[in-house]
Amino acid sequence: MCDAFVGTWKLVSSENFDDYMKEVGVGFATRKVAGMAKPNMIISVNGDVITIKSESTFKNTEISFILGQEFDEVTADDRKVKSTITLDGGVLVHVQKWDGKSTTIKRKREDDKLVVECVMKGVTSTRVYERA
């Protein structure tokens, strides 16, 4: 069910990411460095456990989870959040909650690309990845 996401993906375009990070509460210096990074995303599945790694010159992160089960996550900008990821109509829906706030990250396949849509309040960022 998540096989379409498995593989190594490289960032090829990013829209509105600085505004999204600002809405999340990421500081200026971190936004500038993170905004210039071109991360690779590596997605793998082992039984029920899905792993998403992000590797860049800015920071490397890794989360492993089971669909529908809440887990603790430390984000690339060091927020400590409670995350839940579900599969809804072929879209991986990742909800992060912290300090009474929440953001949603949707990962979906479109043609041969992986499209990541990050939403915080009224701000949306779209980041497009291609197979590496």
Curated annotation (Swiss-Prot):
It comes from the Eukaryota. InterPro entries: Calycin, Fatty_acid-bd, ILBP, Lipocln_cytosolic_FA-bd_dom. The modification Phosphotyrosine is found at residue 20. A motif (Nuclear localization signal) lies at residues 22-32. The keyword Cytoplasm applies. Keywords: Acetylation, Cytoplasm, Lipid-binding, Nucleus, Phosphoprotein, Transport. Monomer. Homodimer. Interacts with PPARG. PANTHER family: FATTY ACID BINDING PROTEIN. This is Fatty acid-binding protein, adipocyte. It comes from Homo sapiens (Human).
